[in-house]
Amino acid sequence: MKHRVKKHRLSRNSSHRMSLICNLSVSIIEHGRLQTTLAKARALRPFIEKLITKARVPDSLSVRRLLLSRIKNEAAVTKLINEVARRYTDRPGGYCRIVKTGYRVGDAAPMAIIEFV
């Protein structure tokens, strides 16, 4: 039974799952939107929203270091702090939207686009 299980496992072990989420978050920060499976989009949304909430704090070295420990890409962290987080200074949350786009041709996996609001 799945009582009190909060994580999306995505059929991967923890290190593989974390690197997948980190790579997806770098992609959405760089491009603004991302097409992926619905399960991966649902797993990515809480992770990226927590990063944006942390990045909204004015220039702080500790915040930059925390973000670098999470996504490990200097350019993405800089863009997250300087561009993405500044768009949402007045917004209390809900920075991402998931739009279902149908099913993938090869294996009929449900697909979705995750993008910044």
Swiss-Prot record:
Ribonucleoprotein as UniProt keyword: yes
Lineage top rank: taxon: Bacteria
Molecular-function GO terms, alphabetical: structural constituent of ribosome
Record has Transcription as a keyword: no
Cited InterPro entries: Ribosomal_bL17, Ribosomal_bL17_CS, Ribosomal_bL17_sf
Regions annotated as coiled coil: none
Annotated GO biological process: translation
Any Pfam family matching the protein: Ribosomal_L17
GO cellular component, one term: cytosolic large ribosomal subunit
Keywords: Ribonucleoprotein, Ribosomal protein
Subunit structure: Part of the 50S ribosomal subunit. Contacts protein L32.
Family indicated by similarity: Belongs to the bacterial ribosomal protein bL17 family.
Name this polypeptide is given: Large ribosomal subunit protein bL17
Organism: Neorickettsia sennetsu (strain ATCC VR-367 / Miyayama) (Ehrlichia sennetsu)
Gene designation: rplQ
